Amino acid sequence: MSSAHNAYNAGIMQKTGKAFADEFFAEENQVVHESNAVVLVLMKSDEIDAIIEDIVLKGGKAKNPSIVVEDKAGFWWIKADGAIEIDAAEAGELLGKPFSVYDLLINVSSTVGRAYTLGTKFTITSELMGLDRALTDI
């Protein structure tokens, strides 16, 4: 059997019948853990590499010091508490060519959190937009 925590037939998935039910419904497994963490996974490209280096790691980290960027072969894995925001207009200036929020969205592989676009900005947030904070137009 595999000992990996995220593999098939590992952990609780190794169990069947009563053993599975006992662990699945155990008191310690009935707790919801609150998290403000958000994740953005971007496919690598020349444009995205520049955006990661100059916008996310510099300006983004200045706004949100919890941002962590990991190189995952063909992808950039970005995690932060609260929110990750990328302004496509700023990216266009950096790249020296037109770059819309839709050009950015083509490279979005995965997200954890609530994703939305507003104007030229793409945001992943842990907030309930419209409930925790008003979503305003620009």
Swiss-Prot record:
Which InterPro entries does this one have?
A: MethMoxRegMmoB, MOase_MmoB_DmpM, mOase_MmoB_DmpM_sf
Q: Which Pfam families match?
A: MmoB_DmpM
Matching SUPFAM superfamilies, A to Z? Monooxygenase (hydroxylase) regulatory protein (SSF56029)
GO molecular-function terms, A-Z: monooxygenase activity
Name the Gene3D superfamilies on file.
Monooxygenase component MmoB/DmpM (3.90.56.10)
Alphabetically list the UniProt keywords.
Monooxygenase, Oxidoreductase
What's the stated role of this polypeptide? The B protein acts as a regulator of electron flow through the soluble mmo complex, switching the enzyme from an oxidase to a hydroxylase in the presence of the substrate.
Instruction: Describe the protein's quaternary organization and the partners it interacts with.
Output: The soluble methane monooxygenase (sMMO) consists of four components A/MMOH (composed of alpha/MmoX, beta/MmoY and gamma/MmoZ), B/MMOB (MmoB), C/MMOR (MmoC) and D/MMOD (MmoD).
Similarity comment: Belongs to the TmoD/XamoD family.
Q: What is this protein called?
A: Methane monooxygenase regulatory protein B
Q: Which organism is it from?
A: Methylosinus trichosporium
